[in-house]
Swiss-Prot record:
It comes from the Bacteria. This is Ribosome maturation factor RimM. An accessory protein needed during the final step in the assembly of 30S ribosomal subunit, possibly for assembly of the head region. Essential for efficient processing of 16S rRNA. May be needed both before and after RbfA during the maturation of 16S rRNA. It has affinity for free ribosomal 30S subunits but not for 70S ribosomes. GO terms for biological process: ribosomal small subunit biogenesis; rRNA processing. Binds ribosomal protein uS19. Residues 104-177 form the PRC barrel domain. It is found in: Cytoplasm. It comes from Synechococcus sp. (strain CC9902). The PRC barrel domain binds ribosomal protein uS19. GO terms for molecular function: ribosome binding. The keyword Nucleus does not apply.
Length: 180
């Protein structure tokens, strides 16, 4: 395993910096986490630009935009629009051991990435979950075995079973969803 892959295993990407807000260096973060305190409670956070290791920055303030899944955050060392724009596209990260404890049958959404997607428990996989897109409803991005991509709403009616230990999830899509 390459050194860069080794340090990546020590981190979880819990959001992506997708834009700037205003002139004072505020950043818009699209979360990939069900824990809003990662974007609102002041303290150390880590930001990783593509190809670089995460660097520690201090979160000063954070708030969720009303009616949206986006958070607006202010970092200690980012005080103008130019500095903020330099961080757009960066990952918002936490140490891998910073996962909140979960109850029986619960899982972290990020754990879905890498799972095989199947249409029945005994069938061959139709693809692999490659990303999670947060929004009004979370979407699973699945790379199909033919290389095409498929977006599946992550709701219990369509994804009724998740088998983390076995590395797969079950899809029961309504007619036509697989054809999109």
């Amino acid at each position: 395993m390459a050194d860069s892959e080794e340090w990546l295993e020590e981190w979880l990407t819990v959001g992506k910096i997708v834009g700037v807000q205003g002139l004072q260096g505020e950043l818009r973060v699209n979360p990939a986490s069900d824990f809003p305190e990662r974007f609102t409670v002041p303290g150390p956070r880590w930001v990783r630009s593509k190809g670089s290791p995460p660097r520690e920055m201090q979160l000063k303030t954070g708030r969720q935009l009303p009616g949206k899944s986006l958070f607006v955050v202010r970092l200690d060392s980012v005080d103008n629009r130019d500095a903020a724009e330099a961080l757009v596209g960066s990952d918002w990260m936490v140490p891998a051991d910073d996962r909140p404890q979960l109850g029986e049958g619960e899982f972290h959404l990020l754990d879905l990435v890498g799972l095989e997607a199947r249409l029945s428990p005994d069938s061959d996989p139709i693809g692999t979950v490659t990303d999670l897109i947060s929004g009004g409803n979370d979407l699973l991005e699945i790379k199909r075995t033919d290389g095409s991509k498929l977006l599946i709403p992550f709701v219990e009616a369509i994804v009724p079973e998740v088998h983390l230990k076995d590395g797969w999830l079950l899809l029961t899509p309504p007619p036509g969803l697989m054809d999109l």
